[in-house]
């Protein structure tokens, strides 16, 4: 069994009260390592979450956007004053959430959740793309159904794009020739009853390629709504096959800022990178702050 080790016992990013768009929460960050720098794309919220009404109400409206920060060491980040991505289409009327970024053929694809706010199931997987990590374009729905927790694989398999997504409560895979039409949807992982991942599961960030398979970090939720991180290994040539899955979580809420926040008892990742034989896993804590935890590549053994 292996677990992640926190690089810091304090958040590496927290809300900035002077910035209207990120004054209440920063969490759930995608990460890309390019040009010897960590590029972090995080979800931010301008308001607290009121989720117990029959449907979303305008007086409680919270809008999510995507902020951008950059670092040379993976822990000390320079932040930008304005979001790099905001909602532009009706499906994004209440914002853009939980980004996951994959580089394919020198282009970056960000998949995220667009929340329309017309009812609580008005969330869709959406996509934008960029050539430089700064200018994003596209803003279109990937799957027109209530769905989230999606990312693309960094390589095509048998000439096809590969999508991971989450139809409740499982992790699914699908394929496409053009990033528009998706087919052969299939469950690859399901929750396990009477465990830390009994209620639902979903991928963290895009799987990371290793010599022995695709490393998939994912979140699991128990019946008390505690969010933890787990890990599995997918077959290199056929990522629909799970060849290993650790029984125990690799990270769970333990520190005060992971236990207490807008949504308590949550560690939730949208991205990890391999740098100098070390995996850096960025995670949202209690839907309020961002932390980072690491593990040496050689210690990841199933």
From Swiss-Prot:
Pathway in which the depicted protein is active: Nucleotide-sugar biosynthesis; GDP-alpha-D-mannose biosynthesis
UniProt superkingdom: Bacteria
GO BP term, example: GDP-mannose biosynthetic process
Protein name from the UniProt record: Beta-1,2-mannobiose phosphorylase
Keyword Cytoplasm: no
Record's keyword annotation contains Transferase: yes
Keywords, ordered alphabetically: Carbohydrate metabolism, Glycosyltransferase, Transferase
Entry similarity comment: Belongs to the glycosyl hydrolase 130 family.
Assembly and oligomerization: Monomer.
GO MF annotations in UniProt: glycosyltransferase activity
């Amino acid at each position: 069994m292996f677990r992640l080790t926190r690089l810091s016992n304090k958040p590496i990013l927290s809300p900035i009260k002077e910035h209207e768009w990120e004054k209440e929460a920063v969490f759930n960050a995608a990460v890309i390592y390019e040009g010897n720098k960590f590029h972090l794309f995080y979800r931010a919220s301008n308001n607290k979450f009121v989720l117990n009404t029959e449907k979303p109400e305008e007086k409680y409206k919270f809008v999510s956007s995507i902020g951008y920060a950059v670092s040379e060491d993976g822990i000390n980040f320079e932040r930008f004053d304005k979001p790099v991505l905001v909602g532009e289409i009706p499906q994004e009327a209440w914002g853009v959430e939980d980004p996951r970024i994959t580089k394919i053929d020198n282009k970056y694809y960000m998949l995220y959740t667009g929340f329309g706010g017309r009812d609580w199931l008005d969330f869709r997987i959406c996509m934008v793309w960029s050539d430089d990590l700064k200018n994003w374009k596209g803003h279109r729905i990937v799957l027109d159904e209530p769905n989230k927790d999606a990312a693309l694989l960094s390589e095509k398999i048998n000439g096809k794009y590969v999508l991971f997504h989450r139809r409740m409560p499982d992790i699914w895979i699908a394929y496409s020739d053009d990033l528009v039409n998706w087919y052969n949807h299939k469950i690859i992982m399901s929750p396990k009853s009477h465990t830390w991942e009994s209620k639902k599961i979903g991928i963290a960030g895009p799987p990371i390629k290793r010599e022995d398979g695709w490393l998939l970090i994912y979140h699991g939720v128990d019946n008390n709504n505690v969010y933890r991180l787990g890990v599995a290994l997918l077959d290199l040539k056929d990522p629909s096959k799970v060849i290993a899955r650790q029984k125990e979580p690799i990270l769970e809420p333990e520190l005060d800022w992971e236990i207490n926040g807008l949504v308590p008892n949550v560690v939730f990742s949208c991205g990890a990178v391999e740098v100098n034989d070390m995996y850096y896993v960025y995670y949202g804590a209690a839907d309020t702050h961002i932390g980072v935890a690491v593990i040496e590549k050689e210690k990841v053994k199933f």
